[in-house]
UniProtKB/Swiss-Prot annotation:
One of its GO terms (biological process) is conversion of seryl-tRNAsec to selenocys-tRNAsec. This is L-seryl-tRNA(Sec) selenium transferase. The modification N6-(pyridoxal phosphate)lysine is found at K292. Converts seryl-tRNA(Sec) to selenocysteinyl-tRNA(Sec) required for selenoprotein biosynthesis. Its cofactor is pyridoxal 5'-phosphate. It comes from Geobacter metallireducens (strain ATCC 53774 / DSM 7210 / GS-15). Pathway: Aminoacyl-tRNA biosynthesis; selenocysteinyl-tRNA(Sec) biosynthesis; selenocysteinyl-tRNA(Sec) from L-seryl-tRNA(Sec) (bacterial route): step 1/1. It is an enzyme of class 2 (transferase). The lineage of its organism: Bacteria, Pseudomonadati, Thermodesulfobacteriota, Desulfuromonadia, Geobacterales. It holds the Pfam family Se-cys_synth_N.
Amino acid sequence: MTLFARIPKVDKILEWDGTKVLLGIHPRPTVLNAVRSVLDSLRTAARSGFLKEEELLEGAVASRIEREVARSTAFSLRRVVNGTGVVIHTNLGRSPLSKRVKPLLDEIAFGYSNLEFDLEKGERGSRYSHVERLLCDLTGAEAALVVNNNAAAVLLALSALAAGKEVVVSRGELVEIGGSFRIPDVMGQGGAILREVGTTNRTHPRDYHQAVSEQTALLLKVHSSNFAVVGFTAEVSATELVAIGKEHSVPVMADIGSGCLLDLSPFGIRGEPTVQEFVKAGVDVITFSGDKLLGGPQAGIIVGRREFIAPLTQHPLLRALRIDKLTLAALEGTLRLYRDERLALAEIPTLRMLTASAAELATRARSFARRIRRASPPDIRLTLTSGISQVGGGAYPLLELPTTLMAMEADGISPQEMEIRLRGMEVPVTGRIHRGRFLLDVRTLQDDDIPFIAAALSSLAD
């Protein structure tokens, strides 16, 4: 009898004791789907000649079915330990929220709220009112609006203010913002006509002056936060662009990307303009993200002059891009922390990680290492070494943040295997491999990550 013919049938598997236990815990369709999935993989292996006889033993098949049931019933979106040293890690969810936001999220998520109800007037209200005043107070802008992400904010602004007309932008600012989404594509989708000026590395005020015509709806400035052009370069500042716009009676819009609300230069973090700087420069419409340097949830934030924000609030596209109540609650909770700069720096994880000093990180690393060593097998070797962290999230591409790394080694386990096994844990642990060692960057580790790291390292000895 061939191995293919020996693969057990579904009805036989359902009679196994192990399967009956699973059926007593999980819905029958869940177990059946797991059985069929395992049988499909066994048949595929048999056809390709890679199936081994021991893989058909009842215990082996039952174990695979149990693992498949566990996989299919587990949440797909899970907590991950970020030991990569990339603070605003796009693939790991960007900025973690402050725990100060949790009480408000709990209240809004599990009950009714005044999302679109004016409690004073007893009539329909606006969901945007919950953060508009806050944003205006924090940035100095006249009006504000929020949507579901910054690309949506740019799309809405261009659709409302420049559909069918020209938008003048420097060639050096036609950036790709990630996921193959490019500024020219967003502009085209919004119905705007792109008018490029200058060159990749140099754009001058005269380039804008010469490009303005009766068809010009906007002068657009895009902050190149995710790359840097160095050497023989020239660009037109926001202040200069506003002056050009006023001379020609053309409004100015700026997509500044990361959306920093605090001056981080005292911490050695320079080069990212704050939202307030663009407002003071007189830019009419400013868009930025909520989940990058701001340290909140994914959102697209629009601030600026009332006469230019008003058309956005009436545009049909706004409903398709509108922010949901949980994101709105998380954003309001985060923004309220900015009323006290010291509180924001202490309580918003992204800011706390970015501004941590090298000495502070070294102290934390020694503390973390002691805790991990106490809970890990003796054959796990942990040493501390210096290294570099990155901001991530398309901000400060050239900035290197000094940090302390925990280097993990184990006999008989390569760094690549260690990385795979730690990533496969119930709470995955991610890090990076450099010069033959698996590394965890203390900057992006949280205090409550340590038990998960210790448990993951202990599993290596099993």
